[in-house]
């Protein structure tokens, strides 16, 4: 398996190895029950004298999330098998099972117990998983085989959308973001469920078109646009600057800052401006600790670092936030979260990832399982889909490769990227002002969009493909300059060389985790330009000094601004500690009298 699936070779050997462990873990979730068939269980733990061994039952939502990783590592046979398994236990009305006991064949599991179908999000997750598997593999035979079950799932979702806003509801469909805790009180529809359903809707038109179901295609297009509009408008809190948690049965909103909007951010479903606001809040320590993302902000009155849904750190949503940061071109906020999941590979049960951890200390909770598969999947998901930027589109014989490599990496090789029957290999090398890319393939021809990410403020960019000048149209974003290079891969090796002048990148901080530690690391909250100056916003502990490395043209500090009690004040809190060639190290000093975490913005020119 390891020799036929996606691997990376980067300057971070632990990251390369952690990906191999994650793929092994995702193979280990497969269980064959002689009475029920073969599918994915959620995790393993000790059973004691009378309990199940951790989450050793079949869990539909967990499995569907995990397929997002397996689609881009090439572990397709297991994905197709599990999607069929879940369809086998689909309820008559189309709802996909949340959990199936290993003893389900020996008791009245599906009728006498409330657990099999009590989650609403499992069905749109399964629909999304079918879509993503088809996009990666191009398996049209599977799509036609599963389509009757897919249509039943689609019709169930339509039956629980009752208020006309295009989004299915918790009140009619079941649980989604939370299972326990006051945070779920009075919820009519939460942003997590709304996001997963809207993501599923984005795949329905293409699949319906592929199987010739024109009626479903037309309905899905209209519903997709309606749902996305609701998601963007109903949940945005302009006063607070981030997306709310839920719409309430009372007609109001629950405006708590939670990790849940990341379910939409990871699919790029939110408009760019509001998404930036939410991503900045999620990047700060109130959600993103040194070791991962809390379910609920530490500033909430409901926050409890030991409570299941109200403050613990979950690796699976950590991956959601990491991928969301990459999706909106914010790699300096996404890397440390992915890196935390990487370090968990080696800090607890070797090669495994715990279910959840304390929101206050870097330690798993005693009552949770040490080997949870949707935690393991959230290393390859942000790594391959985010940092590497791989998006296969096998039905159209196409793919996108849009890497966002850390600014201090000089190379990266990616082996065995799969799109349908085509294997793609990529080697990327960088030095000051130059990126060189070698691309190769084996299998049927594909159209590849290679999207280079150049430092913010870059100028005079040129592209050569196989030694010949290649015209491209640069695309500016708030955080980088993108150069899309279109080419056909059909076996022969292709070389891309990109040159530019100027520009500046920030190196994401690395945080070496120690079991039991509290959260004290630096966060890059934002990096953009304003009035010709680069603007670097960081968050750290008062009284602490931090180092941040910049790579690109030499810069000087224009001014430094602190945010304190809602009022900004200018203060000399930053200095250039080192500068040579294209490297500038900043020393950032937060005032000693401010012992809480504070936001600091440095303007550079």
Positions of PLM-derived features:
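A general alpha-helix detector
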Residues: 65, 203, 260-263, 320
């Amino acid at each position: 398996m390891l020799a036929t699936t996606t691997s990376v070779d980067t300057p971070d050997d632990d990251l390369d190895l952690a990906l191999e462990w994650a793929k092994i873990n995702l193979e280990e979730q497969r269980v064959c029950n002689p009475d029920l068939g073969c599918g994915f269980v959620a995790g393993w733990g000790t059973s004691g004298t009378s309990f199940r061994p951790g989450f050793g039952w079949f869990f539909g939502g967990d499995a569907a999330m995990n397929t997002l990783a397996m689609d881009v590592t090439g572990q397709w046979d297991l994905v197709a098998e599990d999607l069929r398994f879940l369809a086998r236990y689909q309820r008559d009305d189309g709802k996909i099972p949340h959990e199936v006991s290993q003893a389900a064949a020996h008791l009245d599991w599906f009728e006498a117990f409330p657990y099999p179908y009590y989650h609403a999000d499992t069905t749109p997750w399964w629909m999304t998983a079918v879509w993503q598997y088809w996009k990666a593999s191009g398996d049209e035979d599977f799509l036609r085989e599963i389509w009757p079950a897919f249509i039943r799932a689609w019709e169930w979702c339509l039956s629980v959308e009752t208020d006309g806003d295009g989004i299915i509801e918790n009140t009619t469909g079941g649980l989604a973001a939370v299972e326990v805790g006051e945070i779920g009180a009075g919820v009519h529809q939460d942003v997590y469920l709304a996001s997963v359903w809207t993501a599923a809707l984005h795949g329905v038109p293409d699949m319906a078109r592929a199987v010739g179901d024109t009626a479903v295609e037309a309905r899905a297009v209209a519903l997709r646009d309606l749902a996305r509009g609701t998601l963007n408008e109903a949940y945005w809190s302009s006063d607070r600057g981030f997306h709310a948690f839920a719409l309430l049965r009372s007609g109001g909103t629950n405006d708590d800052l939670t990790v849940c909007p990341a379910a939409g951010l990871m699919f790029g479903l939110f408009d760019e401006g509001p998404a930036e606001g939410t991503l900045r809040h999620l990047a700060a320590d109130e959600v993103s600790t040194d070791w991962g993302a809390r379910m609920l902000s530490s500033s909430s009155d409901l926050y409890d670092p030991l409570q299941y849904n109200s403050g613990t750190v979950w690796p699976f949503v950590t991956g959601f936030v990491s991928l969301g940061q990459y999706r909106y071109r914010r790699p300096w906020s996404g890397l440390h979260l992915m890196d935390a999941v990487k370090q968990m590979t080696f800090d607890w049960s070797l090669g495994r990832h715990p279910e959840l951890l304390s929101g206050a200390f870097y330690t798993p909770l005693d009552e949770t399982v040490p080997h949870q598969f949707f935690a393991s999947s959230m290393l390859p998901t942000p790594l391959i889909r985010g940092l590497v930027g791989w998006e296969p589109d096998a039905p159209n014989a196409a793919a996108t490769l849009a890497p966002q490599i850390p600014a201090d990496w000089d190379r990266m090789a990616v082996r065995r990227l799969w799109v349908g029957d085509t294997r793609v290999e990529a080697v990327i090398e960088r030095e000051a002002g130059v990126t060189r890319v070698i691309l190769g393939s084996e299998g049927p021809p594909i159209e590849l969009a290679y999207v280079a990410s150049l430092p913010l403020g870059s100028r005079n960019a040129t592209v050569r493909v196989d030694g010949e000048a290649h015209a491209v149209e640069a695309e500016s974003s708030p955080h980088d300059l993108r150069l899309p290079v279109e080419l056909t891969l059909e076996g022969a090796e292709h070389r891309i060389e990109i040159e530019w002048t100027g520009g500046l990148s920030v190196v994401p901080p690395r945080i070496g985790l120690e079991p039991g530690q509290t959260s004290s690391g630096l966060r890059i909250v934002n990096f953009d330009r304003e009035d010709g100056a680069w603007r670097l916003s960081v968050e750290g502990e008062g009284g602490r000094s931090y180092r941040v490395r910049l790579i690109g043209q030499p810069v000087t500090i224009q001014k430094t601004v602190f945010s304190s009690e809602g009022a900004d004040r200018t203060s000399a809190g930053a200095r250039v500690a080192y500068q040579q060639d294209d490297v500038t190290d900043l020393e950032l000093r937060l005032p000693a009298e401010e012992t809480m975490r504070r936001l600091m913005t440095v303007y550079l020119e």
